[in-house]
Curated annotation (Swiss-Prot):
Note on cofactor: Binds 1 zinc ion per subunit.
Cofactor field: Zn(2+)
NCBIfam families per UniProt: Q_tRNA_tgt, tgt_general
Biological function: Catalyzes the base-exchange of a guanine (G) residue with the queuine precursor 7-aminomethyl-7-deazaguanine (PreQ1) at position 34 (anticodon wobble position) in tRNAs with GU(N) anticodons (tRNA-Asp, -Asn, -His and -Tyr). Catalysis occurs through a double-displacement mechanism. The nucleophile active site attacks the C1' of nucleotide 34 to detach the guanine base from the RNA, forming a covalent enzyme-RNA intermediate. The proton acceptor active site deprotonates the incoming PreQ1, allowing a nucleophilic attack on the C1' of the ribose to form the product.
Native species: Xylella fastidiosa (strain Temecula1 / ATCC 700964)
A GO cellular-component term linked to this record: cytosol
Pathway: tRNA modification; tRNA-queuosine biosynthesis
Name of the protein in its database record: Queuine tRNA-ribosyltransferase
First-level EC class: transferase
Enzyme active site: D92 (proton acceptor), D267 (nucleophile)
Signal peptide: none
Gene Ontology terms for molecular function: metal ion binding; tRNA-guanosine(34) queuine transglycosylase activity
Region (RNA binding) residue spans: 248-254, 272-276
Length: 377
């Protein structure tokens, strides 16, 4: 039996408010998962993540397998002990990272052979290997091993990729069960931007049976409208008693629009990556701190923000100075701000769904940016 219990608590249109319960903690949904690629969210301590409102984080199976390796992580009793995070952890399967290697990989029915980016050594990864790795990591949510369909892709290419992922899904399920792993196992819906293929993928995954469903193969170059069409197609077809995870999609606008279309879980490197590039998220848009207009600006990043950077009184001028000097404190403070913004955005959406005011919240979100909300179906 899976260690995950999911409870759907409220809906407002397609937007869903729920709770994921694990032995190590509960997660309120919709939720945003900070990304700890190498076992750490860049520049942020685990205790700080908790203070910012994060309840679950993502670890990267592919990178942790290559470095430091499973033996080191096993010495710590798994990823929780290794990175000193006591809450739930979701690990991806490594499929997307293998996809990103492009010309350095070879895909077969059995799995993927690739040149490791660390030392060039030939490495094989398939469904069984991915499940074994994630068992050692001892994550609370395990993702199946799949092929991320490229974009653009013809319908024939997308179909072949989706069908391969379905065969790998069955092997992932079998391997996960054979390992007696009580972590939740999520399937991943593929099919490119072709709704009928997405539907076939979902049907096949439901026939196998999973604890939740990831929506993969998006945020790879498709337009926002193409993505929304897929989400709108899947929403009435997905089981209501299972969490839905949109993988790798992370602009604030994307989160709002995807919650409006029934998504429960998100992850993205954007908050910390943008902070390292001097871009800070606010309710009125993005502050690009490298612009000259901030050179003598004594305001915080955003008035009324509760993050350590803004509450601490660090001014835009100071942050710009740090950024221009390549001082690591700039990216640390920026990451704290951006993650606070994301977690607060999710908390505000949860409250609005519970109150039945999500679509009023959505309108105000766009109006604060001087924009009109995009149309909903």
């Amino acid at each position: 039996m899976s260690r995950l219990q999911f409870q759907l608590q409220a809906t407002d249109g397609a937007a869903r408010r729920g709770q994921l319960s694990f032995p190590c903690g509960t997660v309120q949904t919709p939720t945003f998962m900070p990304v700890g690629t190498y076992g750490a969210v860049k520049g942020v301590l685990p205790g700080q993540l908790c203070d910012l409102g994060a309840e679950i984080i993502l670890g990267n199976t592919f990178h942790l397998f290559l470095r430091p390796g499973l033996e080191v992580i096993a010495d710590h009793g798994g990823l929780h002990g290794f990175m000193r995070w006591n809450g739930p952890i979701l690990t991806d399967s490594g499929g997307f990272q293998v996809f990103s290697l492009a010309h350095r990989r070879k895909i077969s029915e059995q799995g993927v052979t690739f040149a490791a980016p660390t030392d060039g050594a030939q490495v094989f990864l398939g469904p069984e290997e991915s499940m074994k790795i994630q068992k050692v990591l001892n994550s609370d949510v395990v993702m199946i091993f799949d092929e991320c369909t490229p974009y653009p892709a013809t319908e024939d290419v997308a179909r072949d990729s989706m069908e391969l992922s379905l065969r790998w899904a069955q092997r992932s399920r079998d391997a996960h069960d054979a390992l007696d792993n009580d972590a939740a196992l999520f399937g991943i819906i593929q099919g490119g931007v072709h709704p009928d293929l997405r539907g076939r993928s979902l049907d096949g995954l439901q026939a196998i049976g999973f604890d939740g469903y990831g929506i993969g193969g998006l945020a790879v170059g498709e337009s926002e409208s193409e993505r929304n069409v897929i989400l709108e197609y899947l929403h009435p077809r997905l089981p209501t008693d299972r969490p839905r995870y949109l993988m790798g999609v992370g602009r604030p606008e994307d989160l709002v629009e995807s919650v409006a279309r029934g998504v429960d879980m998100f992850d993205c490197v954007m908050p910390t990556r943008h902070a390292r590039n001097g871009q800070y998220f606010t309710g009125f848009g993005t502050v690009k701190i490298r612009n000259a207009c901030y050179a003598r600006d004594v305001d915080p990043i955003e008035q009324g923000c509760g993050c350590p950077a803004c509450v601490g009184g660090y001014t835009r001028a100071y942050l710009r100075h740090l950024d221009r000097c390549n001082e690591m404190l700039a990216s640390m403070l920026g990451s704290l701000h951006n993650l606070w913004y994301y977690e607060t955005l999710m908390a505000n959406m949860r409250a609005a769904i519970t109150a039945g005011t999500f679509f009023a919240f959505r309108r105000s979100f766009y109006l604060a940016r001087g924009l009109d909300p995009p149309p909903l179906p």
